[in-house]
Amino acid sequence: MKKVDVKESAVGRETRIRKQWNEQSIFEQSIQNREGAQSFVFYEGPPTANGLPHVGHALGRTIKDVVARYKTMAGYKVLRKAGWDTHGLPVELGVEKQLGISGKHEIEEYGIEPFTKKCKESVFTYEKQWREFTESIGYWVDMDDPYVTLENPYIESVWHILGTIHEKGLLYKGHRVSPYCPSCQTSLSSHEVAQGYKTVKDLSATVKFKVKDSENEYFLGWTTTPWTLPANVALAVHPNMEYVKAKQEGHVYIVAKERVQDVLKENYEVLSVHKGEELLNTSYTAPFPMKEVTNGYRVIGADFVTADSGTGLVHIAPAYGEDDYRVVQSEGLSFLHVVDEKGEYTEVVPFLKGKFVKDCDVDIVRYLAKEGLLYHKEKYEHSYPHCWRCDSPLLYYAGESWLIRTTAIKDTFLQNNDTVTWYPDHMKHGRFGKFLENMVDWNISRNRYWGTPLNVWECESCDHQFAPKSIADLRKHSTKETPEDLELHKPYVDEVQVSCEKCGSAMNRTPEVIDVWFDSGSMPFAQYHYPFENKELFEEQFPADVIAEGIDQTRGWFYSLLAVSALYTGKVPYKRVLSLGHVLDEEGQKMSKSKGNALDPVDLVGKFGADALRWALLVDSAPWNAKRFSERTVLEAKSKFVDTLVNVYSFYVLYANLDEYNPNETYDVKRTKLDEWVLSRLHSTTKKVRTALDDYQFTNAAREIAALVDEVSNWYVRRSRNRFWESGMNAEKAAAYETLHDVLVTISKLIAPFTPFVAEDIHLNLTGSSVHLEDYPVVNESLLQPKLEAEMDAVLQVVELGRSNRNQHSLKVKQPLAELVLLEHNENDMDWESYRDIVMDELNVKAFHVELDETKYTSYQLKLNFKKAGPKFGKNVNAVNGWLKQLSQDEVQNFVSTERAVYEAASGEEVVVTTEDVLVEKVAKSGFSNTTNGQYTVMLDTNVTEELLQEGVAREFIRAVQEYRKQLNLPVNLRVDVILDTEEELQQTLTNHKELLEENLLVKQFTFGHLTNEDDELSLGETKVRIKLSAAQ
């Protein structure tokens, strides 16, 4: 075995292992070795390569890698195809910035062809950084053969899906109100909108709509979007709701009966009550009368009107509200647009022409006030949608869009979701399920340039549509020869003209591109260019056994995958979804570069190593929980887990090499109870870890492994050190080597999916083979000893209590104590005699015994809990307190046992006192200190005799010299001669404990003499000792 370089950094180790993986094609071998095995399928959600990775990506890549590595080691064939999301607005916005242009007008002036070429060039800006990040974090995924959404084969598969949907009559062109981004100048789908809500404060207004031909009667309407008022064409009431006419300060106002108090507040008189249906068709004067409204400005009925807020009357602007649009269509009222595609008022509103509407709420309200039409204004906090790409506030905007009739197969969506296992499970019928319940038709078209072109050609003369499902299909119907290398992007596909099968006229492609979420949702099919090729491979890789991405993908990729698959095949595309929580900063705030609280995962790997970062992300909390995260989190993972394991491994290699131990040779071995215990712990942990990983409970699995590594380091190795330090090779020492070797090899396999680099380093050095080509450990039932584990757990509890006891009373473990008494509070069959020596050695005590009668070593003190007893006992409270103080210890003991006692007050009244009224404190016998955990109480004799004090000094001296040896980098097996120069009293103490010193310090000759200032000095408290070490002669 190679010597472990303890000075090698984690990054150095990981760089070395990566090189070895690449040179020996270990990733490729891990897949090839499972050829013919059952497939386990996972899909890689495609990131965009025009932005850099963040800590959330580190979590996602870690989880996916853990799953893929574990399933591979568990015997499955796991293909891991990378992917790139390369279309959409982020790319366009980046290119606009690069070119110094802004908006669709300037893009078209620049030229669509050069613009889309620039987009294509820019999509892989950070591909090198993504590849380096992916490899450095240890995520094994095939980046040499990824699916890329901009490539023709991928787009052709998307066209086949869209063409099939069109064939089914589910793709249609409609005029409707959709969420619209005025900055990007395109509409968005409902699932895109769901990703961008923000809590904002907007100016709201309660507006007076004067009843026509009345002097002082007004409908009151409330709106949080005053900018829409110039487009008003109607007021809506609920036909079955009650409304009142109420007089206030000379005016009569009409509002919902349920809302009158909240709206008018005070000083009003209700004149009459009317059903909403009685108000229908009442005409009013609009705040902004428009000549274009030839049929409108009257009250209509609508079921969506409620009395939950506002006035119970809804101002209707059909161009800017979905409900508004529908009700106006059904009523046959006028339609009025007052806003252009940039979100600015048109000449229809002259005094605000050219202004962005969301900036005009104050202007609108001022105008209303000036005209006497403003009843009330206030800031209103509400959730408002923003563009998930550019962060601009959205408008609801009427226009033509291409939509997929997802509502027609809503039941399929819901049924498919019912078959999926969600982590966390509440997502299934909660956030995701509710979104499906309330879904609307998918707005699939985008009035942009860089994206998959919508493959629909429309006839110039009739209503016929043609939706080619392949390039060959398009060529077959085109009126002129199409290039062999036709690129399926704008403007190239726009130049292809088709002849109408119905009337023979020319057909042109509709100019839109599609929603990028449809691109990524098509990946199960398009990644293999299905159905044009790879049919068998696709069928083997569909559906996914698991997908894992951030929770923000609930209404993104998780939805688009489900939707595309349901629309195309009717089938569900995945069996399990791991919805990962946000990685937050230390204060629980979302990380962002603008706030300056974002952590760069590349920097974290560079400082602490990928294993530490991965472990920190896994062990802290379940991956679907939001987690607070910082550099300190990663540092703790490194020091507590990775470094601890490396220390155990280096300890083993150091001593095994010194003793020339060869695990491949056969030795006579005699296992101790400690060996049997650690092997049982190893296999019981293996059992728990496999169960947890099979249920995707990564954190539970990681914590089980962490506990095992801690016990191996801080219990097994520490308790076995003397065996490793012995000279020669005997049966017990050989058993220690054999046991620790088996433990380390198995742990390296257990952690391989979690921390792949350190796992590889250990396994490769101990066995000569890659851990990632091994099978995952299975439980050896014959090595499980539950009773032994329970007994050792009890020992560990007692030792921990003893250490805590010493800490509380400032008694160093190096200071021997006379006695430890263990009080057991629950009867059990624990054989403490078998563990006597371990407990005494660990806690450095001279005697140990178990006592069932705790009254010999403890007593109870009772104090009245005045907070509870005061109200209960009233005037008797002080008398009860005095009575408690004078109880004998037997009476106190009886009270604690029975949990009640009766005090007879001076008045003769019997007062029942229970343990709920009293604070019960257990007090140790004089000269003892106690610590308890409910099951056990550890009593330590704190009287330190002179003899014990001197031994404590000797043990402290041993610790100091051992540290000194480390500083000198002396070989651990080097026997030394020691010369000491110190005061006479310490000389005598050390002489009295010469054997103890020689045994623990590998000292051959131990002498006292005069040393010069050039020699080194050790500190033992306030005492100084000069020391000189040399190799023993």
Swiss-Prot record:
A motif ('KMSKS' region) lies at residues 590-594. One of its GO terms (molecular function) is tRNA binding. It is found in: Cytoplasm. It catalyses: tRNA(Ile) + L-isoleucine + ATP = L-isoleucyl-tRNA(Ile) + AMP + diphosphate. ATP binds at K593. Its cofactor is Zn(2+). GO terms for cellular component: cytoplasm. Its EC number is 6.1.1.5. One of its GO terms (biological process) is isoleucyl-tRNA aminoacylation. Keywords: Aminoacyl-tRNA synthetase, ATP-binding, Cytoplasm, Ligase, Metal-binding, Nucleotide-binding, Protein biosynthesis, Zinc. IleRS has two distinct active sites: one for aminoacylation and one for editing. The misactivated valine is translocated from the active site to the editing site, which sterically excludes the correctly activated isoleucine. The single editing site contains two valyl binding pockets, one specific for each substrate (Val-AMP or Val-tRNA(Ile)). Catalyzes the attachment of isoleucine to tRNA(Ile). As IleRS can inadvertently accommodate and process structurally similar amino acids such as valine, to avoid such errors it has two additional distinct tRNA(Ile)-dependent editing activities. One activity is designated as 'pretransfer' editing and involves the hydrolysis of activated Val-AMP. The other activity is designated 'posttransfer' editing and involves deacylation of mischarged Val-tRNA(Ile). Belongs to the class-I aminoacyl-tRNA synthetase family. IleS type 2 subfamily. Monomer. NCBIfam families: ileS (TIGR00392). This is Isoleucine--tRNA ligase 2.
